[in-house]
Amino acid sequence: MPNSEIGMLLTYLAATADRNMETASSYLSPDVKLVFPQGQFDSLSQMAESMAGRYLSMGKTHDTWDISTAEERTVVVTTGTLHGVNLHGVAFAGVRFCDRFVVRSGLISEQHVWNDLAESGVLDSR
């Protein structure tokens, strides 16, 4: 049911934003593929290590959710904007993002992330 996927994804994203990797990891399949602008990762700990030193906090405001279910998977695409605080303590908002998730058997098997953080310059603002 699509609403259950959205609820699960929101819980997962909140746990990652809060850096509660144990809870967030419980939503991932053992063979998860995490693809971010900084590279591809097989675990949240790898992803978090790569993201360390980029910003102090990050959150998402979701504008759209698109869901497609076929055979044994559900694909969910969400778009919106990022907000947070960079390493210099400067708040930012309004940075575009797009996340694509593949959910199989109730677990996230893929997460693909696109955003305009690098292009926007907000991480370097002082």
Q: Where are the language model's segments positioned?
A:
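Low-complexity, intrinsically disordered terminal/linker segments enriched in charged
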Residues: 110-126
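Short solvent-exposed loop/turn micro-motifs enriched in small/polar/acidic residues
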Residues: 7, 60-62, 92-95
